[in-house]
């Protein structure tokens, strides 16, 4: 039996969503939450501390998934957290992202950048975006498992720049498969807060698909 949030709502784990080196993730059907229960010996490097998890609970995001409520045992010991449950990940090939128009793809990707702007206001630096299993795609992209995210005292603009760079890296390698060298050149040339969405808006022809852009740019 576990206890969730300030009210001590009881939770008995039954439906396992997955497991890893840090712990197990369960489904809480009545509130549509994923509940991450960390193993007794918490890895201080890859697992969120109670203090960090509490701070993350106060950051409003939709696509960079952060803790929403903390989980405790019967003695009040912190064991994990809940987050919004997103339906099972689908293979990118199954949804054939390359056939999306760039207008549609941009509308999907810009959601990650909006969340990057939001977390930067709180001094949060996202991290570890290229590890296997750290994102979900079901028609939208979600970044999950913030175990290596960290708070920084740097200037908020500098944090935003770093977070945008991480999202750019995620999109370039996960979705575009680093096929368009011109994107890297543009990101270096424009610097600062230039995003891949900016590139797609600049370069897209009307109703062009992603595969059409790749074929046009990769000779």
Describe the predicted segments one by one:
Residues 1-13:
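A short, low-complexity linker immediately N-terminal to eukaryotic Hanks-type protein kinase catalytic domains
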Residues 10-71, 95-96:
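ATP-binding glycine-rich loop module of kinase domains
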Residues 27-28, 85, 135-137:
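Conserved hydrophobic "DFG−1" position in protein kinase catalytic cores
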Residues 33, 81, 142-145:
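Protein kinase-like catalytic core scaffold
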Residues 42, 90, 151-153:
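Conserved protein kinase catalytic core
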Residues 62-108:
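Conserved structural core of kinase catalytic domains
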Residues 95-133, 141:
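Conserved kinase catalytic-core helix
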Residues 137-219:
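C-lobe/activation-segment region of protein kinase-like
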């Amino acid at each position: 039996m576990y206890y969730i949030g300030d009210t001590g709502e009881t939770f008995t784990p039954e439906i396992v969503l997955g497991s890893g080196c840090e712990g197990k993730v369960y489904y809480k059907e009545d509130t549509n939450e994923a509940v991450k229960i960390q193993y007794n010996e918490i890895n201080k490097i890859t697992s969120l501390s109670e203090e960090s998890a509490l701070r993350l609970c106060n950051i409003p995001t939709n696509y960079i998934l952060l803790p929403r409520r903390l989980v405790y045992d019967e003695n009040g010991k912190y064991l994990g957290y809940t987050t919004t449950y997103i339906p099972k990940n689908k293979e990118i090939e199954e949804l054939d992202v390359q056939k999306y128009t760039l207008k549609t793809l941009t509308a999907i990707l810009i959601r990650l950048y909006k969340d990057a702007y939001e977390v930067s206001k709180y001094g949060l630096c996202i991290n570890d975006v290229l590890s296997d299993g750290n994102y979900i795609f079901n028609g939208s992209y979600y970044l999950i498992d913030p175990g290596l995210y960290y708070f920084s005292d740097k200037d908020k603009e500098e944090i935003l720049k770093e977070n945008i760079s991480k999202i750019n890296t995620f999109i370039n390698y996960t979705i575009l498969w680093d096929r368009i060298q011109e994107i890297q050149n543009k990101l270096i040339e424009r610097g600062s807060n230039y995003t891949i969405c900016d590139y797609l808006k600049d370069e897209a022809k009307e109703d062009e698909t992603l595969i059409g852009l790749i074929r046009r740019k990769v000779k």
